[in-house]
Amino acid sequence: MRLPVVLAFAVLPALAPATGCARKSEPPPSPLIEKGRQTYAKYCATCHGPAANGYIADNAPSLRSATFLESASDEFIRAGISRGRPGTAMAAFASLLGGPLDPPAVDAIIAFLRVGGPALRALPEGPVVGDVKRGKVVYDANCARCHGTPTQRSSAVHLANPVLLATATDAFLHWAVERGRPPTSMVPWKGALTPVQIDDVVAFVRSMAVPPAAPALPSAMTVAKPSAPLPPRKGPIVLNPRGKAPEFVLKEDLYVSIAQVKKALDDKRRLIIADARTPSDWLNLHITGAISTPYYDTRSLDDIPNDGTWVLAYCACPHHVSGEVVAELRKRGYKHTAVIDEGIYAWQQAKYPVVAAPGLLPAAAPPPMHH
């Protein structure tokens, strides 16, 4: 049995025999792998899970599936971490784009994910030759329920994501369909589909590609330098500072609906809106008036006044990391806090006011919510 990689380092002493016999101790992880473990735990485990098995928030995929690791090149994983998956909860973590990770930190995460995994396979190069129309029929019948459509996300990886399709090879996609992602719900389709049908599906998935929009780059007007942890606050923290307090009705004593928040803004009620995502996400799209308070840096909350003003946090999960921010605020004694229930993309879909980077592509509709 393979132990989850994050837990393996912690339990190695417990695996030693109890007979008193001498046993050669396992070498400690290299500094690079240890750095990757710590970096992963801080930034990635929230959604992908402590053991990288995925599906903790927003259906973040497993990063430990053998069929993923044996087919995903370092370059592909690096692009996924650095550029993210725009329109989803997977942020761009590269410091160049306003995220918290420099290139060595990204490489350390990759080294950590590779620990105990299979060797990288040499997959065929070049495009897959398939029939797009036939592939759509197969996709609609077998894949769309989990993977969605270009305009609607669902419970699994959104295969129409432009950055995914710009960085994934046809061979990577073909291997995923053929071999699945054990032990996740993505089953192997080899046998259920013929090789020609798999080629057709890959051709159809590839046909959904559109050129990804250029990411919003930090500038002197937004951040001090590319690796700055937070955009400096040029606007007010408190919106409508002379307004009355809103009268929210919370679900489960935690969640406030986007409709209530929009009405409070329309009524000029006093409140604070905190974006719990990475600054790179804030740069690309945020609710008008929101400040950047990334979930991994509680220092970002220090300037928020603790005077009874309502503080509303949001994210794209739709409310996992924003829940962490609200939990921290409540721990500090803030009396009026809530999570914006449906998240940023439902807010955008409702055509409520946002600040978006020039050229930002419309996000696919988020999947149905589950508390």
What do the predicted segments below correspond to?
Residues 21-38, 114-138, 249-252:
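Electrostatic cytochrome c docking/interface patches
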Residues 298-347:
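Catalytic cysteine-centered active loop of the rhodanese-like fold, especially the PTP/DSP P-loop
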Residues 25-29, 53-55, 100, 115-130, ...:
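Inter-heme linker and motif-flanking segments adjacent to c-type heme-binding CXXCH motifs
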Residues 1-32, 104-110, 369-371:
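N-terminal export/targeting leaders of redox proteins
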Residues 206-273, 279-281, 357-371:
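Flexible, polar/low-complexity N-terminal or interdomain linker segments that lie immediately upstream
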Residues 29-50, 77-79, 129-150, 173-179:
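Sequence/structural segment immediately N-terminal to covalent heme-attachment motifs in c-type
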Residues 62-113, 154, 160-210:
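Extracytoplasmic electron-transfer domains, predominantly the class I c-type cytochrome c fold
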Residues 76, 172, 295-302:
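Alpha-helical scaffolding within the catalytic cores
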